[in-house]
UniProtKB/Swiss-Prot annotation:
The gene is cox10. This is Protoheme IX farnesyltransferase, mitochondrial. The chain crosses the membrane at residues 171-191, 207-229, 255-275, 300-320, 345-365, 399-419, 448-468. HAMAP family: CyoE_CtaB. GO terms for cellular component: mitochondrial membrane; mitochondrion. It comes from Aspergillus fumigatus (strain ATCC MYA-4609 / CBS 101355 / FGSC A1100 / Af293) (Neosartorya fumigata).
Length: 512
């Protein structure tokens, strides 16, 4: 039996029947079929036994007479042989994928606890790697407005200088200062003795309020300008601050320095003239603390957040001491009397509220832009220790409750403030708890930030509305509570006068 060379079995040659003769194809046939010879003596049963499984075509075709008809079966067998490795490979791949999936599921089910925690932590970090960018602050918006104006325009310069002041932050400081001024108890004014000190009239209290408002705003402008002067290089690395006037070159450093000095001198001068030296000293200390302690400390230690909270807690004390200065008597108007007397407790409680509020507000803000703080080199808990960042926010949110209750306890506000402050503080604590629970993920940081934005004005306005003694007369008239009869005071005055006259008559007779 003669076999073909192995080269003839290659797929390329097998697919080209023109290069092989009929004898070679017949030898390559997998099963050699016996030739059916037509005979008069062969029956149909014998012919059926001789024929193979392939049925004879019912009609005579051209290929029936071809000598190479066996090539058809041979080519079909060769193509099946050539395609079999591919099918085997595909089956192997599908089986391998199925086995890998089963192995993966089995390994996941048998995953060790510490590896599972690590995997979940990495997945959470990937899902929450980037927060939505915050909108630009007021300084950036004013810088954009200034850059769009002509270079010689006066409006361009005014917008650039106003951008140095951080208008929103300055407005918040003025709001907290004037709120404390307005919450100073009316009872202190009612108990004054006109013979000892003149009562403050509407004109003097209004002037004091204007001096306090203007002086506080100018002092805040100076502190914010000094802050921008000390870190333009780092402001350029953050999206929220890279559009500030000194970063963009809208103002020179010399102009910014002169502006900071001028606003500080004007602000402190107005506070000294219109309020008292204690309020002026508090404002000056706040400028120095913010510009020369807090600003450089941001690149050194995470303690900068606590220093910044102290800066935020001083303005309510300024408003309280400004109001206390109007009722201070001669010899009782020193800084010790205004800051450490019994009447100063309300001011310290308001300062404590602002101190505690800084942490949920700033920790949520810093978490949303933690990568920018990290790139700029600012040491913030948001990226150095995110877990502690969330814990601190929750802890100081809870501290808002005792400070608010303390204002009611010492008689600064009425019962309505107790209800309103509990609701507002409860909202803040709820968002702070979610921020701690989710570690800033799932939008909890943004919700806490906006909750703090709304909670503080609600608290301050609520304190002004429910101020102790402000609505007593209205409350009594509406709810019909009995009012002490004025006739009782008249009868008491007549009795006192009659008794005094009886005492004076014997004295006159004895002298005569």
């Amino acid at each position: 039996m003669i076999y073909l060379r192995s080269s003839l079995l290659r797929s390329g040659l097998a697919r080209d029947p023109a290069r092989l003769c009929s004898q070679c194809f017949s030898r390559l046939s997998p099963s050699r079929r016996p030739v059916a010879v037509r005979s008069f003596f062969s029956s149909s049963r014998l012919r059926a036994g001789i024929a193979d499984h392939e049925s004879t075509p019912s009609t005579v075709q051209k290929t029936y007479f071809s000598a190479n008809r066996t090539a058809d079966g041979l080519l079909a067998s060769l193509s099946a042989v050539n395609s079999s490795p591919r099918s085997i490979a595909d089956n192997a791949l599908s089986q391998g994928a199925a086995s890998s999936e089963s192995i993966t599921s089995q390994s996941t089910s048998q995953e060790l606890p510490h590896r599972r925690r690590k995997r979940l932590k990495e997945e959470a970090a990937k899902n929450n790697a980037a927060e939505t960018e915050l909108p630009p602050d007021a300084s950036s918006q004013l810088s954009t407005l200034s850059s769009a104006l002509p270079a010689t325009s006066l409006r361009r310069k005014l917008a650039a200088f106003l951008a140095l002041t951080k208008p929103r932050l300055s407005f918040l400081i003025v709001l907290t200062t004037t709120s404390a001024y307005g919450m100073y108890p009316i009872s202190s004014l009612l108990t004054l003795d006109p013979s000892m000190t003149p009562l403050p009239t509407l004109s003097t209290s209004t002037l004091t309020f204007l001096y306090l408002t203007t002086g506080t705003f100018l002092s805040s402008c100076s502190a914010n300008t000094l802050n921008m002067l000390l870190e333009p290089k780092y402001d350029a690395l953050m999206s929220r601050t890279r559009n500030r006037p000194l970063v963009r070159g809208l103002l020179s450093r010399r102009a910014a320095v002169l502006f900071a000095i001028a606003t500080a001198a004007a602000g402190l001068g107005l506070l000294y003239i219109g309020t008292n030296p204690t309020t002026t000293a508090l404002s000056a200390s706040n400028i120095c603390l913010y510009a020369f302690v807090y600003t450089p400390l941001k690149r050194i230690s995470v303690i900068n957040t606590w220093v910044g909270a102290v800066v935020g807690g001083i303005p309510p004390l300024m408003g309280w001491t400004a109001a206390a200065g109007q009722t201070a008597t001669t010899g009782h108007d020193s800084w010790r009397d205004m800051l450490f007397s019994k009447d100063s407790i309300g001011g310290w409680l308001l300062g404590g509220i602002l101190f505690a509020w800084q942490f949920p507000h700033f920790n949520a803000l810093s978490y949303m832009i933690r990568e920018e703080y990290k790139a700029a080199g600012y040491r913030m808990l948001a990226w150095t220790n995110p877990a502690a960042n969330a814990r601190v926010a929750l802890r100081y949110s809870l501290l808002m409750f005792p400070f608010s209750v303390g204002l009611w306890w010492v008689g600064v506000v009425g019962n309505g403030f107790l209800v309103g402050s509990t609701a507002a503080n409860g909202w803040l604590v709820k968002e702070a708890y979610k921020f701690w629970r989710h570690q800033g993920a799932n939008g909890s940081a943004r919700r806490l930030f906006w909750a703090s934005i709304w909670q503080l004005p609600i608290l301050l306005v609520g304190g002004l509305v429910t101020k102790k003694g402000l609505w007593d007369g209205v409350w009594n008239n509406v709810f019909g509570q009995p009012v002490e009869d004025e006739d009782d005071y008249l009868w008491e005055d007549e009795d006192e006068v009659a008794e005094a006259e009886r005492k004076m008559i014997p004295a006159k007779t004895s002298s005569s």
